[in-house]
Amino acid sequence: MRLVVYLSSLALAVAAGAQATTARGTLMGTVMRGPITPVCAIEQPCDEPAPNVTLLFTRNGTVVGRAVTGQNGRYRVRLPAGAYAVRRPSATTIDKRLAPNRVWVAAARTRRIDFSIDTGIR
């Protein structure tokens, strides 16, 4: 009988630990790129939404999640809670200037994180 109680307690503890480590959160926002012209004017914005941009969310060098922006530059991704580095795959040197390049995902929360890609146009 003690063995059954012990094994049941152990199974509950393992299940509780597994649930805690898989808590997920959501990031959403818009990726903008710019400047898109050397001189910005009121009639012409300096930045524009960046469609079809892939964002890689990595932890300890391993890709944990990815998101691709829509035509309006918006993205949404669910990830396990924790800290992530963010980068673009095989982007040109200019397009690698992604900011911010580190984010934090909170368990059971949705956070808005907007990214910008510096085109280097000056």
Predicted regions: what is each one?
Residues 1-4:
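Positively charged n-region of N-terminal signal peptides that target proteins for export
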Residues 10, 14-26, 30-36:
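Beta-strand-rich domain onsets/edges
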Residues 27, 33-60:
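Short, ordered, surface-exposed loop/turn motifs in non-cytosolic proteins
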Residues 29, 69-77, 115:
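Glycine-centered loop-to-beta-strand initiation motif
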Residues 59-72:
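Short, acidic Ser/Thr/Gly-rich low-complexity loop/linker segments typical of extracellular
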Residues 71, 80-81, 107:
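Surface-exposed loops/turns
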Residues 82-93:
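A short, solvent-exposed beta-strand micro-motif common in secreted/extracellular proteins
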Residues 91-120:
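Structured interaction patches on ligand/partner-binding surfaces of diverse proteins
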